[in-house]
Amino acid sequence: MLVWLAEYLVKYHSGFNVFSYLTFRAIVSLLTALAIALWMGPRMIAFLQKLQIGQVVRNDGPESHFSKRGTPTMGGLLILLSITISTLLWVRLNNPYVWCVLIVLIGYGIVGFVDDYRKVVRKDTKGLIARWKYFWQSVLALGVAFAMYSFGKDTPATQLVVPFFKDVMPQLGVLYILLTYFVIVGTSNAVNLTDGLDGLAIMPTVFVAAGFALVAWATGNVNFANYLHIPYLSHAGELVIVCTAIVGAGLGFLWFNTYPAQVFMGDVGSLALGGALGTIAVLLRQEFLLVIMGGVFVVETLSVILQVGSFKLRGQRIFRMAPIHHHYELKGWPEPRVIVRFWIISLMLVLIGLATLKVR
């Protein structure tokens, strides 16, 4: 939005030309989202406390979690507002990639909001019925997938980028729609499963978003794209602004979500952030890179799948509790230790993922 205003004002003062620089807008997008989150945080926490919108804690969970009962939840609204406002201020609004991410972010946020509302306000422990949750997630993901396929059909935008192989980029055709669906829905639910400890989900989200900001910058630059042997996508550059907004909003939220948390993001935050990361990965043609950089989310999800599968097939559990972060809690690890170690692993995976762009 401000880019267009600056382009009009530059004829009166050349200083406004700075708004055309992607790096400048990326930095101020991060700072804007961070400032909004820090300013709105105390006000939103007070508002949620006034409405008595507190976290529901399972009775069969770790005993250390019982003290979390009543902590304000649905704080993901703070993240979504910060990201959306900052993005709309600093991005070029005629970019279709940006709107794809925002549609998924807001749409999945609404699904998560309804789920949280039913759990916390209406005291329905099941929340939004699972089949309806997956139905609306699927509708949104497929809608965006069809739109993206129509826009980039038979171009580099629908190729599959395989790590370590610079010349292996098969054209997916209609399979692109199916892959997009699974990546968006899968990542959304993976982040949701990871969001079980104070700050556990938000920091890996920040790391992955920061990694994708670098990838988006390279993908939108023809020289760097050719150098790294990745598809050049002219619309990808503006995703840098979205990614840095996620980083800023995430850090701002972490200010209040760090152990011991003053607020939880709830499904409104985790489903939306996961969906946004999945959409960004698909738009950049880096689905495999998401698996590497988002390895913490992948392991958390696999731990649940293995736990459920093992119990149904053998009547035995593999872990003391799933997702796997609860397993380590029940082994006696203090919550902050689990959180920080998962953060360290997440940072390492993001760096490894970025390194694969060059190792081809």
Swiss-Prot record:
Keywords from the UniProt entry: Cell cycle, Cell division, Cell inner membrane, Cell membrane, Cell shape, Cell wall biogenesis/degradation, Magnesium, Membrane, Metal-binding, Peptidoglycan synthesis, Transferase, Transmembrane, Transmembrane helix
The reaction(s) this protein catalyses: UDP-N-acetyl-alpha-D-muramoyl-L-alanyl-gamma-D-glutamyl-meso-2,6-diaminopimeloyl-D-alanyl-D-alanine + di-trans,octa-cis-undecaprenyl phosphate = di-trans,octa-cis-undecaprenyl diphospho-N-acetyl-alpha-D-muramoyl-L-alanyl-D-glutamyl-meso-2,6-diaminopimeloyl-D-alanyl-D-alanine + UMP
Family statement drawn from the similarity comment of this UniProt entry: Belongs to the glycosyltransferase 4 family. MraY subfamily.
Bilayer-crossing regions: 27-47, 71-91, 94-114, 132-152, 168-188, 199-219, 236-256, 263-283, 288-308, 338-358
Membrane topology: Multi-pass membrane protein
PANTHER family xref list: PHOSPHO-N-ACETYLMURAMOYL-PENTAPEPTIDE-TRANSFERASE, PHOSPHO-N-ACETYLMURAMOYL-PENTAPEPTIDE-TRANSFERASE HOMOLOG
EC code(s) of this entry: 2.7.8.13
Pfam families in the record: Glycos_transf_4, MraY_sig1
Organism encoding this protein: Photorhabdus laumondii subsp. laumondii (strain DSM 15139 / CIP 105565 / TT01)
EC primary class: transferase
Locations listed in the record: Cell inner membrane
Cofactor(s) listed in the protein's UniProt record: Mg(2+)
Protein name per its UniProtKB record: Phospho-N-acetylmuramoyl-pentapeptide-transferase
Keyword Transferase attributed: yes
Entry GO MF terms: metal ion binding; phospho-N-acetylmuramoyl-pentapeptide-transferase activity; UDP-N-acetylmuramoyl-L-alanyl-D-glutamyl-meso-2,6-diaminopimelyl-D-alanyl-D-alanine:undecaprenyl-phosphate transferase activity
GO biological process, one term: regulation of cell shape
InterPro entries on file: Glycosyl_transferase_4, PNAcMuramoyl-5peptid_Trfase, PNAcMuramoyl-5peptid_Trfase_CS
GO (cellular component) term, any one: plasma membrane
Pathway in which this enzyme or protein is active: Cell wall biogenesis; peptidoglycan biosynthesis
Classification lineage: Bacteria, Pseudomonadati, Pseudomonadota, Gammaproteobacteria, Enterobacterales
Stored NCBIfam families: mraY (TIGR00445)
Function, as annotated: Catalyzes the initial step of the lipid cycle reactions in the biosynthesis of the cell wall peptidoglycan: transfers peptidoglycan precursor phospho-MurNAc-pentapeptide from UDP-MurNAc-pentapeptide onto the lipid carrier undecaprenyl phosphate, yielding undecaprenyl-pyrophosphoryl-MurNAc-pentapeptide, known as lipid I.
